From Swiss-Prot:
Pfam families registered for this protein in UniProt: UreE_C (PF05194), UreE_N (PF02814)
Coiled-coil segments on the chain, per record: none
Biological processes annotated in GO: protein folding; protein-containing complex assembly; urea metabolic process
Protein name: Urease accessory protein UreE
Molecular functions (GO terms): nickel cation binding; unfolded protein binding
Keyword Cytoplasm in annotation: yes
Disulfide bonds: none
Primary subcellular site in the record, as a coarse category: cytoplasm
Keywords: Chaperone, Cytoplasm, Nickel, Nickel insertion
Ranges annotated as spanning the membrane: none
Alphabetical list of InterPro entries matching this protein: UreE, UreE_C_dom, UreE_N, UreE_N_sf
Family in the record: Belongs to the UreE family.
Amino acid sequence: MIRFTQVINSEGRDNFTDRENCLIVCLTMDERTKSRLKVCLNNGDEAGLFLPRGTVLKEGDLLQAETGEIALVEAAEEVVSTAFTDDLLLLAKACYHLGNRHVPLQVELGWCRYLHDHVLDDMVKGLGLGVRVERAKYQPEPGAYGGSISGASHGHHHH
């Protein structure tokens, strides 16, 4: 089994030109936060992630195996809710309320995205945004203090 042990830095990514022929590993957001994980590559082979704790992979990252193989990370499509509006102040308010609930959130111009949750959908609709449930790639914002993406536990942090 191939053992991927490191993420190639940005300089290495910029110099890597064979993206069309490299191995691909397609991972959900939850899987991209795991430092130890058994995965299936696009060629059907099994591989293992053995990455430093706290590593959060993003679409486009390159992984390098102990034996030299390189794999491109792709974000898997997941069931998500995409909230949208042309009113950017309204979008900011929705992001504030979702953030207050420790919801990992992807924020883009005119829309935000989170893992589907009908209770959150109702709250966001109540604020006046449209909500579309769909299968899409999901890449939430990293933690503001350089931490990993969290929120799945819905725990409270005390500072």
